[in-house]
Curated annotation (Swiss-Prot):
GO CC terms in record: chloroplast; mitochondrial large ribosomal subunit
Subunit structure: Part of the 50S ribosomal subunit.
Protein name listed in UniProt: Large ribosomal subunit protein uL2cz/uL2cy
SMART domains recorded: Ribosomal_L2, Ribosomal_L2_C
Organism: Panax ginseng (Korean ginseng)
């Protein structure tokens, strides 16, 4: 990904650094509209996910996370921008006439061929079960449940590593640093997700953030006591508590939020690194 810097004509462009976006001209049969209502509200209209609302209209692209076109070679026709994710997507034309979108693997170019199956080459963009991969393979779009489709390592630049295979399970090191077990029958795609330099982007101004549907983040200490436990006081006052809390009074900033006695606790060999 190439980072595009603007001329310093205004303060907003002076601080702006964006990726040279690939143009998007999606196929009509691979997109559908979304009706976003509530913007972070639940059925009662109460905010449950903050700082959401507005933003430009989007069309959702149907991404093939399952890669179930087995043993049929496909060719990368386009590399497109997807407003619903940081990663780019590829349009694949398969030999049987099927057309699908997949996540763009790093280094893949237009004209490359990909295939999914059980005995396919260990090549960037190919999808196959973990049991057929050698140790040390870099992978992404990893299934947790066989046949459900990839759920892990799908963000831009994400990559996991196959570090061991024993019995019916394979040991993976995920992008977060977590080491966990996954069934060897689950599939994954070889390689790393593209658009690695996405963290080098700088939007430069607040309006660009609003286009993405992100609203301003207001600190609780500058609110009134009726709005937040940190609010109130004369002038710049501290939060008035031993530890910070959420707007609803629950402990924040450090308390573990993972559900206890979750079924996957036995599958996690090492927690993610903070």
């Amino acid at each position: 990904m190439a980072i595009h810097l603007y001329k310093t004509s205004t303060p907003s462009t002076r601080n702006r650094a964006v990726d040279s976006q690939v143009k998007s001209n999606p196929r009509n049969n691979l997109i559908y509209g979304q009706h976003h209502c509530g913007k972070g509200r639940n059925a009662r209209g109460i905010i449950t996910a903050g700082h959401r609302g507005g933003g430009h209209k989007r069309l959702y692209r149907k991404i093939d996370f399952r890669r179930n076109e087995k043993d049929i070679y496909g060719r990368i026709v386009t590399i497109e921008y997807d407003p619903n994710r940081n990663a780019y997507i590829c349009l694949i034309h398969y030999g049987d006439g099927e057309k699908r979108y997949i996540l763009h693997p790093r280094g893949a170019i237009i004209g490359d061929t990909i295939v999914s199956g059980t005995e396919v080459p260990i090549k960037m963009g190919n999808a196959l079960p973990l049991t057929d991969m050698p140790l040390g393979t870099a992978i992404h779009n990893i299934e947790i449940t066989r046949g459900k489709g990839g759920q892990l390592a799908r963000a831009a630049g994400a990559v996991a590593k196959l570090i061991a295979k024993e019995g019916k399970s394979a040991t993976l090191k995920l992008p977060s640093g977590e080491v966990r077990l996954i069934s060897k029958n689950c599939s994954a795609t070889v390689g790393q997700v593209g658009n690695v330099g996405v963290n080098q982007k700088s939007l430069g101004r607040a309006g660009s953030k609003r286009w993405l549907g992100k609203r301003p983040v207001v600190r609780g200490v500058v609110m009134n006591p009726v709005d937040h436990p940190h609010g109130g006081g004369e002038g710049r006052a501290p939060i008035g508590r031993k530890k910070p809390t959420t707007p609803w009074g629950y402990p924040a900033l450090g308390r573990r939020s993972r559900k206890r006695n979750k079924y996957s606790d036995n599958l996690i060999l090492r927690r993610r690194s903070k």
